[in-house]
UniProtKB/Swiss-Prot annotation:
Pfam families: DHHA1, tRNA-synt_2c, tRNA_SAD
Source species taxonomy: Bacteria, Bacillati, Bacillota, Bacilli, Bacillales
Chief location category: cytoplasm
Keyword entries, A-Z: Aminoacyl-tRNA synthetase, ATP-binding, Cytoplasm, Ligase, Metal-binding, Nucleotide-binding, Protein biosynthesis, RNA-binding, tRNA-binding, Zinc
The protein's enzyme class: ligase
Function: Catalyzes the attachment of alanine to tRNA(Ala) in a two-step reaction: alanine is first activated by ATP to form Ala-AMP and then transferred to the acceptor end of tRNA(Ala). Also edits incorrectly charged Ser-tRNA(Ala) and Gly-tRNA(Ala) via its editing domain.
Cofactor note: Binds 1 zinc ion per subunit.
Protein name: Alanine--tRNA ligase
One GO MF term attached to the UniProt entry: tRNA binding
Name of the gene encoding the protein in the UniProt record: alaS
Enzymatic reactions: tRNA(Ala) + L-alanine + ATP = L-alanyl-tRNA(Ala) + AMP + diphosphate
Length: 879
């Protein structure tokens, strides 16, 4: 067996199959862009379904790849076992209707045993086959020459991971030797059993069937080969280490974690688990974020958030109590740079995303862990080993603890979670969310009547704003009708329509429908389930009938403003990528005539300087008068051109490609200007965050941008007039006023302090003795809590011995301060307790040190009663 690095093993695998006339398929993004059945790309074959199910014919039926993959169905096992990972690489060779079992098996054996390649000792390899797969058994036995005692028939040898290709499989196992298991009584000590001695190296699937969405199986058009070999596991065998984590794919990460934590890997099993969790999870989140996923509270984002927070929790066991994972990203990039240079290239961006997420969780982590520990302690005192489900929900809802993280933590403490209690609280939250939703009269929820209507309707509004057409159907009160009259509000289907139906963020057109003796206002247009345009109308005059000729007219000014804003969003999208980075992707948009809104992925707020650069880039492209070309292309051709496809959007075989000069190219079904010069002007009015990793820009164009700037100029002009200066000198004038205000404030503070001292001196006469303790309890007139504390300091200096309680009313609220001199502390007087008792009387709360404390209250009418409370406190304390 050769001594090889993981990079050499990966390249050797690809080179071997290139010699066997295979084409190399590049590793696809971890985020599936064309497969809604998958959360992540989870295998080498996942990206090749289109070939296996016959939808697409590859140029070469022989394919080889090294595919990055994510599986998260058993996150809780990662770190505790030798080979569980959330991120891994799958080496695979594939045949689409070309070679089949014999070639696949012989080539696998050649790669593993030939001295030119891996050069395993043949005697250490065993294989498994499906009990009914006699063909595979015979090939192993007679063609390749494996002794029959090393060929095991196993019922589980049928590969099926849900929708997609499936079929019988054969697996190759490597014997690591007796040091990993030698008990002849162990029923699992055989290739394919649950043991650490015989490691599965390679899985060869003979794909003969397609697993359909309805769980039926149909024969594939041609027999195919789908193989998979985990790079991490193969590397552990070749590098002769006990687990995958000791390979060169993980050890540099572990070494860097050692440096950060000042702990050593290999010293304790518990700490080793933490090292493994961190090393695995940083690989996953680095690659996933690099491929466009972002931490959030749902879907893929929730998986990333859970992994980051799980790693942070385990890092605490290594003494790491601050953000650290972001420091590991360059290490991941360096390990993988030969085959995946993009991680190293985007390391800065990936690190920033992770750091922001770490900082966010650290803000609440300690509080959450303290609460976790206290709840466990309380339950133990009760003799319970069940962690309350409602507390699991509270930790998630308040402190951002993923449910799975809490479950894992409490299980380590010997507890189980009350799932029913958690479900009950989650259902309550869902009900609250449902009740909070605004109920609107919209066509977003389609009635069955719209599903039943299937007319021959065509949209012609890309280049026509009015059209002679025919009424195909009328719908009122969920029923088709023959005729509608003045005052009716209903829905109409047209044979041909110039009205754009709301989609892709662009709002629907409005306008009018006319006949010889009737008119109707079109207020909304939506798409029916069958793709036809449904026009919501109100008949202003006359009546309309089925099959009646009509004249449909889009409101031109409305549409003109909309298309300017829509084209501007395309320019903005590209400008964001130029300024902030290629990671920026559209997350939503709204295109209205008066404004545009654009949501995009980014890990922190956009600076004022960046916003200026973005705005300038968009305007420069407007002023360059770039032509806007719109063409229909095949989807593959459009993507080859570099057209941006929006994640989550579904596209047909033919798509509209909107190209703005040589600056922007996107797939888009909306309406646009002919030349960017028509937009005139672009102005950003606001940038905000709308969720973790998602930002929003709102902007105006054309006349609205002109009006917006004029409003700002008017404000500037009026402000200058009021301050009796010119617009150019306004900043200087404001600075001067700020200096004057600061000086005036100092004078006010000085006078207030003097008045406070005078008042302090005047109320010293109000001191009275309670149970031998001098007491001053008084309502005073001050402007804020700072002045109240200053008065307290003054009084404590002047009153050599005693207890003081001061109260003030400001803005309808009660402010309280208590003070105790040093000698009174020895008599157990406590300012914190005094002020807390007084605040309770006023409907508030507070506390503090024994010598000085403050509090607040809600009811000023109770001030007198609150001041009197100190007397009873002293009587009780002196006793």
């Amino acid at each position: 067996m050769k001594s090889l690095t993981s990079a050499e093993i990966r390249q050797m695998f690809i080179d071997f199959f290139k010699e066997k006339s295979h084409s190399v398929e590049p590793s696809a993004s971890l985020v599936p862009h064309e497969d809604p059945t998958l959360l992540w790309i989870n295998s080498g074959v996942a990206t090749l379904k289109k070939y296996f199910d016959g939808r697409v014919i590859p140029d070469n039926p022989r394919i080889v790849n090294a595919q990055k993959s994510i599986r998260t169905n058993d996150i809780e096992n990662v770190g505790y076992t030798a080979r569980h990972h959330t991120f891994f690489e799958m080496l695979g060779n594939f045949s689409i209707g070309d070679y089949f079992k014999k070639e696949a098996m012989e080539w696998a054996w050649e790669f593993l045993t030939d001295e030119k390649w891996i050069n395993f000792d043949e005697a250490l390899l065993s294989v498994t086959v499906h009990p009914e797969d006699d063909e595979a058994y015979d090939i192993w036995l007679n063609d390749i020459g494996i002794p029959k005692e090393r060929i095991i028939r196993i019922e589980e040898n049928f590969w099926d991971i849900g929708e997609g290709p499936s079929g019988p499989n054969t697996e190759i196992f490597y014997d690591r030797g007796e040091s990993y298991g030698n008990d002849p009584q162990d029923p699992e000590l055989y290739p394919g059993g649950e043991n650490n001695r015989y490691l599965e190296v390679w899985n060869l699937v003979f794909s003969q069937f397609n697993h359909n969405p309805d769980d039926t199986y149909t024969p594939l058009p041609k027999k195919n080969i789908d193989t998979g070999m985990g790079l991490e596991r193969l590397t552990s065998i070749i590098q002769q280490v006990p687990t995958n984590f000791e390979t060169d794919l993980f050890m540099p990460i572990i070494r860097e974690t050692e440096r950060i934590s000042k702990r050593k890997y290999g010293n304790s099993e518990a700490e080793d688990t933490s090292f493994k969790v961190i090393a695995d999870h940083i690989r996953t989140v680095s690659f996933a974020i690099g491929d466009g996923a972002m931490p959030s509270n749902e879907g893929r984002g929730y998986v990333l958030r859970r992994l980051i927070r799980r790693a942070i929790r385990f890092a605490k066991d290594l003494g790491v109590n601050e953000p650290f994972m972001y420091q590991l990203v360059p290490v991941v990039g360096d390990i993988m740079k030969d085959f995946y240079p993009e991680v190293q290239k985007d390391a800065g961006y990936i690190s920033n995303v992770i750091k922001v997420e770490e900082e966010r969780f650290h803000e609440t982590l300690n509080d959450g862990l303290i609460i976790l520990a206290s709840i466990i302690e309380e339950e133990r005192k009760k003799g319970s080993e069940v962690f309350p489900g409602e507390e699991v929900f509270r930790l998630y809802d308040t402190y951002g603890f993923p449910k799975e993280l809490t479950e894992e933590y409490v299980e380590q403490q010997g507890f189980t979670v009350n799932q029913a209690g958690y479900d009950k609280e989650m259902n309550k939250q869902r009900e609250r969310a449902r009740n909070a939703r605004q109920k609107v009269d919209s066509m977003q929820v389609q009635d069955t009547i719209f599903t039943e209507i299937n007319v021959d309707s065509t949209f012609v509004g890309y280049d026509q704003l009015q059209k002679e057409t025919t009424i195909e159907a009328l719908v009122k009160d969920k029923n088709q009708i023959e005729e509608a009259n003045q005052g009716d509000v209903l829905y109409v289907f047209l044979k041909e329509t110039p009205f754009y139906a709301e989609s892709g963020g662009q709002v629907a057109d409005n306008g009018w429908i006319y006949s010889e003796n009737a008119s109707a206002y079109v207020s909304d247009v939506q798409k029916s389930p069958n793709g036809d345009h449904i026009h919501q109308i109100e008949i202003k005059e006359g009546s309309f009938k089925i099959n009646q000729p009509v004249h449909a007219v889009v409101e031109r000014t409305f549409r003109n403003h909309v298309i300017k804003n829509h084209t501007a969003t395309h320019l903005l999208h590209q400008a964001l990528k130029d300024v902030l980075g290629s990671h920026v992707n559209q997350a939503g948009s709204l295109v209205r005539p008066e404004r545009l809104r654009f949501d995009f992925s980014h890990f922190h707020g956009v600076t004022a300087e960046e916003l200026q650069q973005i705005e300038l880039k968009v305007n420069e492209k407007i002023w360059e008068s770039l032509p806007v070309a719109i063409d229909s292309k095949k989807i593959d051709e459009a993507k080859a051109m570099g057209a941006m496809a929006l994640f989550g959007e579904k596209y047909g075989d033919i798509v509209r490609v909107v190209q703005i000069g040589d600056y922007s190219i996107e797939l888009c079904g909306g309406c646009h200007v002919i030349n960017t010069a028509e937009i005139g002007l672009f102005k950003i009015v606001q940038e905000t965050g709308i969720g973790a990793g998602t930002r929003r820009i709102e902007a105006v164009t054309s006349k609205q941008a002109y009006d917006y700037l004029n409003t700002k100029l008017d404000l500037l002009h009026n402000s200058a007039q009021k301050l009796k200066t010119s617009e150019e000198q306004l900043p200087e004038r404001i600075e001067g006023l700020q200096v004057e205000l600061k000086d005036s404030q100092k004078q006010v503070d000085s006078l207030s302090a003097k008045l406070s001292n005078l008042e302090a001196s005047s109320i010293l006469d109000e001191v009275k003795e309670i149970s031998g303790v001098p007491v001053l309890a008084q309502e005073v007139n001050v402007k804020d809590m700072n002045q109240l504390r200053s008065m307290m300091d003054e009084l404590k200096q002047k009153l050599s011995s005693g207890v003081i309680l001061l109260a003030a009313e400001n803005n309808g609220k009660v402010q309280l301060v208590a003070g105790v001199t040093k000698d009174m502390l020895e008599k157990n007087m406590h300012a914190g307790n005094i002020v807390k008792q007084a605040a309770t009387v006023c409907g508030g709360g507070g506390g503090g040190r024994p010598d000085m404390a403050q509090a607040g209250g809600k009811d000023p009418s109770k001030i007198k009663e609150a001041l009197q409370s100190v007397e009873q406190y002293i009587v009780d304390t002196v006793k």
